[in-house]
Every structure is written in structure tokens, then in C-alpha cells.
Amino acid sequence: MREGIIKHQPESDPAAPPEYAPGEAPTLEAQLVDFVDEIAYNNHDIDDGLTSGMITVEQIRAVALFRAAHDEVSARGIADARIVRHQVVRHIIDRCTRALLASTLANLEEARVESVADVRGAGRRLVAYDPEMAALVRELKDFLLKNLYRHFRVVRMGDKAQHILRDLFAAYAGEPLQLPPRHQARIPSEGIHRVVCDYIAGMTDRFALDEHRKLFDPLVRV
């Protein structure tokens, strides 16, 4: 699992510990997880963007992958826009998954893979889209980057989140007694910064917001 995390990006870190074989390809499972994450995130973001109104159907129809799915679903005569949206997303997920499976199986056959060692020594990632699907997915990702991730409301929320995290870190690092006792107990052996980072990393969005209010809003009970 750790090796898969280290090799999450196509270009592995050459400084990675030797036990993670930095010069070799990750396992098929790790390669597959990279694509599964991407498929899930892309389509979740399509749904979120349309639901929030930050992007419109008319805008995203400029993306070939979405347009093909939307045309097929719309031809069924469904009147409910919410149902149409959900079925379009499911259609895109299905198309990406099938394309990834077909291309990967072809790559495995071409590379004559019979063992994990064959995967590691293939010299390339064997879990991959064919060039046509890769281009379609890239077009979708470029659209989401330009129209959703850089939407002014998203940028504002991202900046707000950074301020909250900085405030929390400064508060805990400045006065460690504000940390729960079990986290305070780790400080002598691990250091205040490591402990604070771990504590904040384990927070949900809601918990972080509540903690920020408790620490900085004098009207909120601690």
C-alpha cells in the first residue's frame, strides 16, 4: 500500500526508500487505483458542478465525453433533469471503465505479463487508456480545471480553508495545552509540529470549522 501511495504520480520519486523499488513500475493494483480515483473524482465533480450551478449543461456539452453521454440519455425522453444528470454521470463512468479495462487487457497481452515481476519490469504503466480515450478524459479534466476548480466561489472556499488550517496550526503549536491529552502525550517523543499536523489531518471539514469557532469565537462554548 505504501509503495502504491509513493508511486501515485506517473513519475515516481527517485529518492523513495529502496524497499519501495523506486525504479520499477507499481503493482497493477496500485496503477488501477490511480485511474479509479480519477474516474470517481471527475464524475463526482461533474455532478457537484451541475448541482451547484457553477457549471451548466450548455457549457459542459462542449466536452465530447459529456456530450455523447448526454445525447444518449436525452434520447430516452426523461423529463427530470436530476435523473438525466445522474444517468449521464453513470454513462461516463461506465464508458471510462470499459475503455480502461479493454486497453489494459490489451497492454497485458502485448507485454506477455505472467507475474508481478513482469509488471514491475514492463518499463511503462500497463493500466492505461487507449490514446483516443486518454484525449477525451484530458479534455474533460481541462474543462473542469478552467470552469469549476478555478471558479471564483471555489477559489474563495479554498483560500478560506487555508486560513482556517493556518489558524488551527498556530493556535495548537502556540499553546499545546489546547490539544486533547492523548495528543499532548505524544509531544515529547514526536515533537509539537508532527503532533499538530497529525491532529489536524485527522479532522473532518465540519470538525475543523467547529474547532476554529471554539478557538477564535468568544461567543462559542469550548
Indicate residue ranges for each PLM-predicted region.
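Histidine-centered, transition-metal-coordinating active-site segments
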Residues: M1-V222
